[in-house]
Structure formats: C-alpha cells, structure tokens
Amino acid sequence: MGSIHLSPLSDLALELARAGALRDFVETGTYVGGALGWAARAFERVWTVEINPEFQRQAKANNPAAANVSYLLGDSASELPKIMGELKGPALFWLDAHAGAGYFADHDICPLVAELETVLASPFEHCILVDDARAFLAPPPPPFDYRKWPSLDQIFAAVANRPGYNIVAIADVLIIVPDRHRHLVAQFCFAIRPKI
C-alpha cells in the first residue's frame, strides 16, 4: 500500500504539484483521513470522497484543523464529477476508493476505470496516482472477486483515451501523468527502484 503523505511518494507528489501548478488535491477512498493533514498543508483546496459514513466521521475527527478540506460521502464514480466542476486548473488525484473481500467493504468495489475516465475527460492536465497497483497488475486473489476489478489492459485503454499521458507502475502505485512530467517520474523511479 502506498502512502501519499509519506516520503518518497509525497516528494514525487509535491514535485509534480510544483511542476504542474497543481493547487488542488482530490482523494477517493478517504478511509480515516491519514493523508488529509498533509494534503491540507500542501494544497490550497482538498476534496475527499468516502463511501463509508463511519470512516468519514473518523476522518473528520482526525483532521479538525483542516479547514480547506471538503468531505463528500458516496460512491466516487458518482461524486467525482461534482468535484471536476469545481476545479479551475489541473489537480493531483490520489485514487484509492477500491475495496473488497471484507477489507474496508463487505463486497468488492472498484470504480477505478470510471474514475480515470472522469478525470481524463477534463480539459486540464491532471496528475493521477493510484494506490494498490498490485491489485491491477494481476487479478487480486480470493477472497477478492477478481471479476469486479479492472484488468491492466482496461486501465491502459482508459488512459489511452487521453493522448499524451504516460503510465508507470512502481512502489505499489500507478503513476499517470502528462508526458511533460515523465522526466520527474523517471527520476523518482531511478531513485527508488532496485538495480537491474
């Protein structure tokens, strides 16, 4: 599991934010708000979507000082279009709304393709980080229902609908950025990957 708010991934996120003038942060899958304090300090505006009311309650309790955070309760595939209408420029997206097999949800939920299609339909050049890449690089094992999770080719097809984007899988994260930021991702990969 990646942690957007911890180094080295947070370093990449902040470098992308600087290079791309990303003032806004959008998270799907709030859980209990572990990344919200970091995001509230690093970005002007923050949106977070959580489907579980108890997790959202805990996230709010864990981040009482985060005044620039907007909390949305519901399915990210339905809530994300509302956020897209609020954006005035490119944003950093942390997509982590997938769950299942009794982990964070009773049944498998994986809105990733719908999320990608929504974000990439925007006229802005957003940067996207997707947590838990291992669940997409190969079918998730039982007790997950792999049929509810997109295959890697489905993810690539969603990204390919928006020409000019690059996708990399490293450190359990899918990194999807405009080609002009590819060098930043390459430097991140060079720094953290094992030698070949």
Functional labels for PLM-detected ranges:
Residues M1-L92, H98-I196:
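A short alpha-helical cap/connector motif
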